Regions:
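PLP-dependent amino-acid enzyme catalytic core
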Residues: 1-161
Length: 161
């Protein structure tokens, strides 16, 4: 279950490896929409994406035994960079994911799902902590959706705050 305490814990943890990206006011989008629009440039993270937040927090929640087994994931790109060294497999995500599950089972690796994991979503949701810290009266947060982990984390934390 995603709780405010978990988000606060994750927020402190991901500070070890992430930048607190500052909101940038967009004149163009504000003019186009008639609203004040701010952008959160997570592309400034050292991996080029927010995914390191979820991956790092998830790894921090693993036991020493789980980490010692080795970690494996499947990714369309950015989540894998957040986890570790990458070996590309397959032509599409589903092929990579199937292979990752196969190797996790065969080798005993700990599989870290890129979005279907509460700890990953919690880590990704730390973005909302930073948004509300900088802009406490935010009315709307528009979140891009791929697998849904970022949307899960951000929307859950927004409701909790």
């Amino acid at each position: 279950m995603l709780t405010l305490d978990k988000f606060e814990e994750a927020s402190e943890k991901v500070k070890e490896v992430t930048l607190e990206t500052k909101l940038i006011y967009s004149d163009f989008l504000s003019d186009q929409t008639g609203n004040k629009v701010y952008l959160k440039p997570e592309n400034m993270q050292f991996t080029g994406a927010y995914k390191v937040r979820g991956a790092y927090y998830k790894i921090s929640t693993l036991t020493d035994e789980e980490r010692a087994k080795g970690l494996i994931t499947a990714s369309a790109g950015n989540h894998a960079q957040g986890v570790a060294y990458v070996v590309l497999y397959g032509d599409v995500y589903d092929e990579a994911c199937a292979k990752a599950y196969e190797l996790a089972e065969k080798e005993g690796y700990t599989f870290i799902h890129p979005f279907d994991d509460l700890a990953v979503a919690t880590g990704q949701g730390t973005i909302a902590m930073e948004i509300f810290k900088e802009l406490p009266l935010v009315e709307y947060i528009l979140v891009p959706i791929g697998g849904g982990g970022l949307a899960t984390g951000v929307s859950t934390l927004a409701k909790l705050l």
